[in-house]
Amino acid sequence: MSGLSRIGVAIDSDLLDKFDSLIGQRGYTNRSEAFRDLIRDELVEKTWESPESQVVGTVTLVYDHHVRLLNEKLTGIQHDFHHSILSTLHVHLDHDNCLEVLVVRGRSADVRKVADVLISTKGVKHGRLTITTTGAEMK
């Protein structure tokens, strides 16, 4: 256990029961790793706040490909932001709807900008940006 510090935490028993249930459902074998992951999540979220932070993530879009010129608009936007987009995946969900997942990387501000432009495009039914860390600062 070199490099690890032991700490004590006082927590309401009802809350602890709920936490134990949650971590059991997620497959944690002990509370320590679950607490470490909670802390890591908060630290990663904090990095998003700085517009200069390097982040990686995904932009997920659902749209009707029959909407006039929507495919062309989305492709044009992607080319405008080619420096932030590493890869795309296109899935035909059914006869009308498509799912597009873009892997993005760069400054937090740039990643948010490309996501905002894509998600707000008329005809996009749903969109979501999910950001995580590049892992460089994580141990």
From Swiss-Prot:
<dbReference type="InterPro" id="IPR027271">
    <property type="entry name" value="Acetolactate_synth/TF_NikR_C"/>
</dbReference>
<feature type="binding site">
    <location>
        <position position="98"/>
    </location>
    <ligand>
        <name>Ni(2+)</name>
    </ligand>
</feature>
<keyword id="KW-0533">Nickel</keyword>
<dbReference type="GO" id="GO:0003677">
    <property type="term" value="F:DNA binding"/>
</dbReference>
<dbReference type="InterPro" id="IPR010985">
    <property type="entry name" value="Ribbon_hlx_hlx"/>
</dbReference>
<dbReference type="Pfam" id="PF01402">
    <property type="entry name" value="RHH_1"/>
</dbReference>
<feature type="binding site">
    <location>
        <position position="90"/>
    </location>
    <ligand>
        <name>Ni(2+)</name>
    </ligand>
</feature>
<dbReference type="GO" id="GO:0016151">
    <property type="term" value="F:nickel cation binding"/>
</dbReference>
<dbReference type="InterPro" id="IPR002145">
    <property type="entry name" value="CopG"/>
</dbReference>
<keyword id="KW-0238">DNA-binding</keyword>
<dbReference type="InterPro" id="IPR014864">
    <property type="entry name" value="TF_NikR_Ni-bd_C"/>
</dbReference>
<keyword id="KW-0804">Transcription</keyword>
<comment type="function">
    <text>Transcriptional regulator.</text>
</comment>
<dbReference type="InterPro" id="IPR022988">
    <property type="entry name" value="Ni_resp_reg_NikR"/>
</dbReference>
<protein>
    <recommendedName>
        <fullName>Putative nickel-responsive regulator</fullName>
    </recommendedName>
</protein>
<feature type="binding site">
    <location>
        <position position="79"/>
    </location>
    <ligand>
        <name>Ni(2+)</name>
    </ligand>
</feature>
<comment type="similarity">
    <text>Belongs to the transcriptional regulatory CopG/NikR family.</text>
</comment>
<dbReference type="InterPro" id="IPR013321">
    <property type="entry name" value="Arc_rbn_hlx_hlx"/>
</dbReference>
<dbReference type="Pfam" id="PF08753">
    <property type="entry name" value="NikR_C"/>
</dbReference>
<dbReference type="InterPro" id="IPR045865">
    <property type="entry name" value="ACT-like_dom_sf"/>
</dbReference>
<keyword id="KW-0805">Transcription regulation</keyword>
<feature type="binding site">
    <location>
        <position position="92"/>
    </location>
    <ligand>
        <name>Ni(2+)</name>
    </ligand>
</feature>
<dbReference type="GO" id="GO:0010045">
    <property type="term" value="P:response to nickel cation"/>
</dbReference>
<dbReference type="GO" id="GO:0003700">
    <property type="term" value="F:DNA-binding transcription factor activity"/>
</dbReference>
<keyword id="KW-0479">Metal-binding</keyword>
<dbReference type="InterPro" id="IPR050192">
    <property type="entry name" value="CopG/NikR_regulator"/>
</dbReference>
